[in-house]
Amino acid sequence: MKRIVVALLLLPILCMALSGCDFWMDGQYVSVEPYSEQNFRPEKDMIEVSSSAQLRQAVVDLVESGARSGIISVASFNDATVHFYMEGAIRNVTQNNPIGAYAVDSITYEIGVYSGVDAVALTIHYRYDGDQVMHIKSAQTVGEAEDHVYAALEKFEPSVAVLIQEYQQTDFEYLVQEYAAKNPDIVIETPRVEANLYPEKGQQRVVELVFTYQTSRENLRQMQELVAPVFTSAELYVQPDAQLREKYVQLYNFLMERFDYSLETTITPAYSLLHEGVGDCTAFATVYAAMCRKAGLECHVVSGTREGEPWSWNLIYFMGNYFHVDLLFCSQTGGFAASLGSEMTDYEWDHSAYPSR
C-alpha cells in the first residue's frame, strides 16, 4: 500500500488582523485557512515531546487512538532535524506499527508555532474511516483470534481485522472452510477469503480477512433463520432413550424423508438441501454430520473418491467401532447401512486423516 509523507511549508500570510487562530510561523499563519481549535477533537491538546523516541511514540498513540489530527511540540528540536525525525516517525507508524500499517493511508504535517511554542500539526488520512481503528479486534494468539473470525462469519460481515500479539503462520482460508463445513446451519454460504497481514513481518500483526459472498447479506440472514428451526427439529426427533445406532438411523430418516431430492451442487448447501430439496454428496454429508453433533452423536465428514470420482460420506461411531455411511448410496439401496472400513471396496480416502478403531 502506497504511503505518502508530505511536509507542507506554506508561504507566510499576514493575518495579524484576523482572529480565531493561534498556529503561527514567525508571527504569521502557516495555512491559508484559519487554523483553529475547531479543526481538532477537543481532546487534541498539544503533546509535549523531548526526544525522537517520544516523537515516534506520540505519532503511534495518535494513530492507535483513531485520531484524525494532532499537535506535537517540537521545541526541543532544531529546524534541521524536525523534518528528519517527523519523516522517521511517520515511516515507523505506517510500516512497522500493525495498526498504522493496516489503517493509515497517509499522514501530512505542517511546521509552525502553536500557542507560542514550535510545533507540528499532523493530519492523518485513513484507508476507510478513522473509526475502523476502534473496530479492530484484539487477541493474544491465533487461537483466540479464531473466535472473532467465527463471529464475523456467523453475521456475514464483509471483513474482520484482528490485532494478534503472538502471530503464527496460519491458513485462514482453510480455517474458514473448515468452520463452514462443521457449521452449515450458521455459515450458509462459504465465502471467498482474502487474507492480508500488517505489517508483512513481525510477531505482532493485524490480520485482515475480507469475505466475498455471491448471495446478499440480507438473503443469507433470511436463509439462516429458515434453516435454524430444521436443525432444532432434527435434534428433537432423536429419542433420548434409543440405542446409539438407532439414533443415527432416526436422523437419517429425518433428513432423507423430507424430499425426493435432486442431485445438484449449490453455494448454499444447507438451505438448498433442507428447503429446496437440492444438494450433492457433500451437502448431505455436512448437514447430516451437523445434525448428529447437535444430537450429541460423533460424526465426521470423509472426503475421498467413490469409483474414482470425488465423493463425500460420513463416519459414525457406535458399538466400539467406526462405521462408514454413504447417505446417497443408502437412499438408492433401500435404507440406512453402516459399513466397516474394510467393506468400503469402491471408496478411497486418506485413512490417517480420520479416526479408526
For each feature predicted by the language model, list its residue ranges:
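Sec-dependent N-terminal signal peptides of Gram-positive bacterial secreted proteins and lipoproteins
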Residues: R3-W24
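Eukaryotic intrinsically disordered, low-complexity regions
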Residues: L18, Y271-S272, Y317, N321
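N-terminal accessory/pre-domain segments preceding catalytic cores
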Residues: G20-P240, S352-R357
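Short amphipathic alpha-helical segments
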Residues: Q168-D171, Q243, K247, F284
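Secondary-structure boundary elements
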Residues: T215-L274
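A short, charged
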Residues: E246, D346-R357
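Periplasmic OmpA-like peptidoglycan-binding domain that tethers envelope proteins to the cell wall
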Residues: L273-T282
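Hydrophobic/aromatic-rich core segments of domains that either
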Residues: A283-D350
